[in-house]
């Protein structure tokens, strides 16, 4: 399902209404979501007995029909106990955690014995079709055949295999979208906001491109195959300079050197003044720290909250953001945004550094645009004009249809070598006029006003 449509409550309703006699159940989820499952059970089904798997408290200790809640890490640590217990239901929440069939945690889930198996996810196609094979290796081990035969068929006839795959999997997938289920949800307005580059950014970007091309050559496939570390390092440096040159390890720059942060602060002025709440997402915690600094300078009285992978109590900042009466900004790392938080008190979302996985972005946005939202949600993807960021956005738009063919819009990463043969074409800065940037910003403002 898309995020926020009540997968948790649906599963708990099933476990309560149709239990397997005398069998315990197992719910496996990211560690940050364990408290969420416990709270939902206590709230809606207080008669159901629960227990949390941890060191010193495991399956051997009790044999009654309890609902075990386990993080993926704890399940892996207790793998040797799995042959000793058979569950009624085995539920994997955020099933993309087992997308890599070679990972130890994935192998552990394959060892689970149960009468029924359920996987909950909004994004099973995060990277490649093998992710889907891995999920179904847990659900129905023989359905898609061996991994080697599956990959051979894909390599021989990708289009034909994807068509057959969709038909083969359709009976086993319940795919619900907001437009089907949450018809009361207000509109979501999405737009790319093109950000200008400062002279410092432009100079650093050009220098990094030049040095990267000298080291890697112009053949994207060869660079990925033979110098993958250098290729990824080049992409990371270019993304960093697009956001803020201060993120480069060899520079210390004032906030004014970042065109993206400058435009963000400018866009926030009217939003905050009008009393709205805002969620700002980034993959870079370092960039969020810089935005926090800029917000403190420009809006010293603004209430700020933060949620990153380093946040110990993930529930607290979300709850405080949801309940505070004043305009507020929540700074969230994409890594922390994937699971277990609701932020629908906000109605403005800024994605500071969109990249090539639309599924990750959708997960983040769905923290705001979900059941309970009562306002139109405005989503800005901040894309630095004329750079690799803009090229990746164009690529995502043109290739979305390819991934729609498999399971209706679940999204996925892209192999850059399939779409760019020339590294220079991928990374080199193109000359974008500031007039275009201003036009796009004006159009974005118009979209808000029209709504």
Which residue stretches match the model-derived regions?
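Short, low-complexity, charge-dense intrinsically disordered segments
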Residues: 435, 439-451
């Amino acid at each position: 399902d898309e995020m926020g449509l009540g997968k948790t409550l649906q599963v708990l309703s099933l476990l309560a209404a149709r239990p397997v006699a005398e069998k315990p159940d197992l719910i496996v989820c990211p560690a940050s979501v364990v408290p969420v499952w416990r709270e939902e059970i206590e709230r809606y089904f207080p008669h159901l007995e629960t227990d949390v798997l941890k060191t010193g408290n495991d399956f051997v200790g009790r044999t009654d029909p309890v609902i075990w809640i386990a993080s993926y890490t704890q399940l892996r640590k207790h793998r040797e106990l799995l042959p000793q217990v058979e569950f009624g239901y085995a539920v994997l929440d955020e099933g993309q955690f087992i997308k890599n069939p070679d990972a130890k945690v994935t192998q552990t889930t394959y060892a689970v014995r149960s009468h029924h198996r359920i996987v909950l996810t909004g994004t099973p196609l995060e990277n490649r079709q093998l992710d889907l094979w891995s999920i179904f290796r847990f659900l129905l081990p023989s359905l898609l055949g061996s991994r080697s035969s599956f990959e051979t068929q894909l390599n021989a006839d990708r289009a034909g295999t994807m068509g057959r795959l969709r038909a083969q999997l359709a009976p086993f997938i319940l795919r619900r979208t907001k437009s089907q289920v949450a018809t009361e949800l207000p509109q979501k307005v999405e737009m790319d906001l093109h950000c200008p580059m400062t002279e410092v950014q432009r100079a650093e970007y050009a220098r990094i491109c030049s040095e990267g091309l000298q080291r890697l050559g112009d053949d994207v496939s060869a660079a990925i195959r033979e110098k993958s570390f250098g290729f990824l390092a080049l992409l990371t440096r270019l993304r960093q300079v697009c956001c803020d040159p201060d993120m480069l390890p060899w520079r210390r720059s004032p906030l004014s050197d970042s065109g993206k942060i400058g435009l963000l602060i400018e866009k926030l002025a009217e939003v905050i003044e009008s009393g709205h709440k805002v969620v700002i997402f980034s993959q870079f915690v370092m960039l969020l720290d810089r935005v926090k600094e800029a917000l403190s300078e420009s809006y010293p009285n603004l209430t700020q909250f933060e949620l990153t992978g380093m946040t110990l109590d993930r529930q607290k900042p979300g709850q405080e953001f949801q309940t505070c009466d004043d305009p507020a900004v929540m700074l969230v790392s994409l890594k922390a945004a994937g699971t277990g938080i609701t932020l629908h008190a906000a109605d403005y979302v800024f994605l500071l550094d969109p990249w090539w996985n639309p599924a990750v972005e959708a997960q983040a946005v769905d923290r705001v645009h979900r059941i309970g939202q009562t306002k139109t949600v405005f989503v800005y993807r901040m894309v630095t004009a004329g750079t690799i960021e803009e090229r990746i956005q164009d690529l995502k738009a043109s290739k979305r249809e390819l991934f729609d063919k498999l399971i209706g819009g679940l999204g996925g990463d892209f192999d850059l070598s399939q779409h760019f043969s020339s590294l220079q074409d991928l990374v080199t800065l193109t000359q974008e006029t500031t007039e275009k940037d201003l036009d796009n910003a004006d159009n974005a403002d118009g979209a808000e006003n029209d709504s």
